[in-house]
Curated annotation (Swiss-Prot):
Keywords of the record: Antibiotic, Antimicrobial, Cleavage on pair of basic residues, Defensin, Disulfide bond, Secreted, Signal
Family listed: Belongs to the beta-defensin family.
Protein name in UniProt: Defensin beta 118
Organism: Pongo pygmaeus (Bornean orangutan)
Post-translational modification summary for this protein: The three-dimensional structure formed by the three intramolecular disulfide bridges is indispensable for antimicrobial activity.
A molecular-function term among this protein's GO annotations: lipopolysaccharide binding
């Protein structure tokens, strides 16, 4: 029983003493740790999950952002796909002229007549 009472405080204090045991995640290109509060000599560079700060040692230059290398072009010759992708879009323009006087005269002279369409039934 005494051994259990000694082991229990050790298990509770162990995550406080060993940072890697507490499960702190790495951040900022694996040079920082996610913590609730940064220690002395550390600067906040980003935010982690669960509202934690990414604490990076301030004595190193961590201004660089991880970069990716550009994708090399494997073939510089043009193919069918290139021709399809370089199709230029055109827009057709239509002019609409209003002949209001002519429409009014034709409606007055003839009257508005509507005819029903012929319906053919097949048996």
């Amino acid at each position: 029983m005494k051994l259990l009472l000694l082991a229990l405080p050790m298990l509770v204090l162990l995550p406080q003493v060993i940072p890697a045991y507490s499960g702190e995640k790495k951040c900022w290109n694996r040079s920082g740790h996610c913590r609730k509060q940064c220690k002395d000599g550390e600067a906040v560079k980003d935010t982690c999950k669960n509202l934690r700060a990414c604490c990076v040692p301030s004595n190193e230059d961590h201004r660089r952002v991880p970069t990716t290398s550009p994708t090399p072009l494997s073939d510089s010759t043009r193919g069918v796909i290139d021709d399809i992708l370089t199709v230029r879009f055109t827009t057709d323009y239509f002019e609409v002229s209003s002949k209001k006087n002519m429409v009014e005269e034709s409606e007055v002279g003839q009257g508005t007549q509507t005819s029903l369409p012929n319906v053919h039934h097949s048996s």
